[in-house]
Amino acid sequence: MKEKLKELQELALSKIEAVKTSSELEEIRVKFLGKKGELTTILRGMGNLSPEERPIVGKLVNEAKAAVEEKLESVLKAIKDKEKAEKLAGETIDISLPGRKKVIGKRHPLDLTLQSMEEIFVSMGFTIEDGPEVEYDHYNFEALNIPKDHPARSEQDTLYINDNIVLRTQTSPIQVRTMENQKPPIKMISPGKVYRSDSVDATHSPIFYQMEGLVIDKGVTFADLKGTLELFAKKMFGDKVQTKFRPHHFPFTEPSAEMDATCFVCGGEGCRVCKGSGWIELLGCGMVHPNVLRNCGLDPEVYSGFAFGFGVDRMVMLKYGIDDIRLLYESDMRFLNQF
C-alpha cells in the first residue's frame, strides 16, 4: 500500500507539472481528489484494513493529498498569473492616441422652462417658497376650502398615505403655510412636483410639475391679477401674444377664471394644436376665497389677494411643440439633445 500511494503521488505531481491550462488542472484534481478520485477511494477503503494498518495508511494518504493539493495551488497560481499577463499584454493602450472628449450635459426642457418662469416672476418682485410633497389633508384640502365630499378628494384623483396624509395634488398647500407664517404683504410663487392618481398616456402623468402664485395685501383687485398674468405671458411668449379670461370655478378662489393665450403655433389663425380656435388654455386663477383667508388667520375685510396656477409640463409642451408628456420623463437622449 505504501508503494502504491507513493506511485499515485508521483503520478499526480508529474501530471500536474505537465498541464498548460486551468481546465486541464481541474481534470487532474477530480481524477485524484474528487469524490471518486483515486486517493479518495483509498481513504474510503480504510475500513477494510486491520486496526494496526489504519493509522499508518491514513497518515500516508493524508500526506499524499497534502502534497497534491499544494502542487495544484502552486501550478494554478502560475497559470492564472500567466493568463493575466497575456491578457494585459493584449490590452495594451497606446497612450499617444487622442483621448475621448467629455460629454457635456444639457439642461432638461422642464428645468429650462421652470427657470424662465421663475426668473420672470422674481423680476416682478415675487419670492420663491417651498414645502413638503407629503402633505397633511388639512393643508391640501381643508384650508383651501375643499370640503370632505369634494370629488378631488376621491381615491381616483388623490394618492393617500393614510386618512390624514396625502401626496400633494397641488402646490397650493405652500401658499397656506406661507400665509400662516408670514404677515402680508405676500408675493410668492411655489414651484414643485405634484401627484395625481392618473394613468400614464400622452397627456397625463401621475407625477408632474406645477407652479402656483399668490399675492396678498390690502386693496388687491382682479385688475392686479390680470395685469400680472398678462405681463408674464408677454415676457414668456413674446409681446405679440394676446390673452383672454374666461369665468370658471375653483373652490379656493372667488371669482375664478381661466386665462387663454393666442396659439404659439399659428398665432391665432387656428391649427391642430389649438383645435382651430386660435387660443390655448394656459392657467387657472382667481381672487383668494374669503374662507381661505380666514383659515390662514387673515381678515378678509382687511386683506384681499389673488392666486394662479400653471402646469409646468403643459407649458413646456406648448412652448416646444411637444405632443406627448411621456417624452419629458423617458430620458431619451435623442429627444433631450434637441434642447
UniProtKB/Swiss-Prot annotation:
Name of this chain's protein: Phenylalanine--tRNA ligase alpha subunit
Originating gene: pheS
A single GO molecular function term of this UniProt record: tRNA binding
Assembly mode: Tetramer of two alpha and two beta subunits.
GO biological process, one term: phenylalanyl-tRNA aminoacylation
Gene Ontology cellular component annotations, sorted alphabetically: cytoplasm
Cofactor(s) listed: Mg(2+)
Pfam families linked: Phe_tRNA-synt_N, tRNA-synt_2d
